[in-house]
Amino acid sequence: MTSSMVVSKATGQILVPYDPKLDVLIGEPIKTIRHKNQLFAILPHTPRTQIQLRAAGIEAPAPILWHYDWASSDGVVPFQVQKNTACLATSHQRAYILNDMGTGKTRSVLWSWRFLHNQGAAKKLLVVAPLSTLKFTWAHEVIRTMPEMKAVVLHGTKAQRLALLARPADIYIINHDGLKTIVKELHARKDIDCLILDELAVYRNRSQRSLQMQAFAQRFVWVWGLTGRPMPNEPTDVFHQCKILTPGSNGLPKNFTHAKTALMYQVDQYRWVPRDGAIDRAYTWMQPAVRYSLDDVVELPEAVYRTIDIELSEQQKTKYREMASEFITMVQDKVITAANAAVAMGKLLQVCAGYVYVKNPQHVVLDSDSRKDTLLELISEASEKLIVFAPWRHLIDGLSQLFTDNAIDHAVIHGETSHREKILNAFQSTSQYRVLLAHPGCLHHGVTLTAATTIIWYSPICSLEIYEQANARIRRVGQRHKQLFLHLQSSEVERKVYRMLRVKQRTQDAFLEMIKTSMATTNGGTYDVEGTTTP
């Protein structure tokens, strides 16, 4: 049933053509008004009413577009894509948010929950997300977007998580694997009725984690699954995700065997391949859904530059402090040159990356799981090919092993790589290699790699020329999509380097300024930086 409707922003009401079955669906007497010989029902324009109208075959406009203040504390105005995403989320108690990386999924669903919360349609929120995103993505985004809401990150031992869960808050945030430690206690919290599953595709296999989530998710009023790449391997990847959000809906088969037969066919004893139209059919099971690419965000420029904060491990923090202290002690004469500053800066950047050159053995590997996990999550989210830049050979070797361990199809290019042209042609012109892992100095001139749309800087390079030329590999004639440049950072030295690269200044200048500040704090008095006397 489709008819003209009138929405009043002032009264928060919607007028819809009257239908007798509305009395049963609404469950209370309905006020009516006659206009131009047509009888209209006067209803509150709320998410609950919208869902009730849909049950009657009436698609009403999403209330969030009419009755929500989108303002955030940092003054960011939502993209139209984010508003459209919030419309879907607030209009359906189960929904798939399949937007690409960089389109603002996190804010979209936070705005959605806050609107429902303000309307009295949702209580508290539980976010289940990758460990590396708990603090620097979700908790920070809550602060930036809605500082009036209190968020608590449930991390640590079971006792620590339970103590954190006992704290009063509006939003609780926990990692996927941490959920099992306090799942019973979370299940008992009836005041938490909205669930966001970030990186939904982690549940694509029949694992204990997936089975537990299938049971756990059913008790929530609102459940939204977020992933930019729901089928990282095969169309059948969607089955267990759908069993969590929409079991028994959209023609989803009852078991995985039936789903596999519907989407794939067997060509020999060990190999199955997708049927024609398998991906489209898999998407019909993932409904209701919204899916936007970075190209759909018209408010963004063609090249989007973003930084991603990651916490250093305790081992990295200790080594970072040691090396910074050693450098300050080394310049006893209080003369800091560009040469010794460059050495110190390089060592600190290596610590942040987790691989440090030393005399014996050749390098030391530090605990950097958070950065590695973040990299893997970014790769899993990307819908197109990617380039990962790492500025040291030992770091490249470590990341290549990480990719191999996680079955990521990749190629490696560094100064000693043979058959470089063959690798680049395969990456650019064939489906081979999902990720190109490279030293930026080996790709900074003449190479066209427009098959990729995303570049991830695992650690910064200190040469502005190499940085710009390396980025230009995907910003060339033939590129048909917007490009995303992601910078991983964990320390002030990395932030300074990236900042200087973006504004085209010498990175050593930024580091010298940092050292000047550190020495003033540590030693006091006067000293020289590049020959300049500073009080």
Where are these regions (language model features)?
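Conserved pre-motif I regulatory segment
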Residues: 61-98
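Walker A/P-loop
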Residues: 92-112
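Conserved Walker A/P-loop ATP-binding site and its immediately adjacent core
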Residues: 106-108, 121-144, 232-237, 391-393
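Conserved Helicase C-terminal RecA-like lobe
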Residues: 108, 113-121, 126-129, 300-324, ...
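Conserved P-loop NTPase motor "coupling/switch" region that bridges the ATPase
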Residues: 122-124, 151, 167-168, 194, ...
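Conserved helix-turn-beta segment of the N-terminal RecA-like "Helicase ATP-binding" lobe
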Residues: 134-157, 245-249
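SF2 helicase motor core recognition
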Residues: 180-185, 233-235, 395-400, 420-424, ...
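A conserved SF2-helicase RecA2
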Residues: 462-535
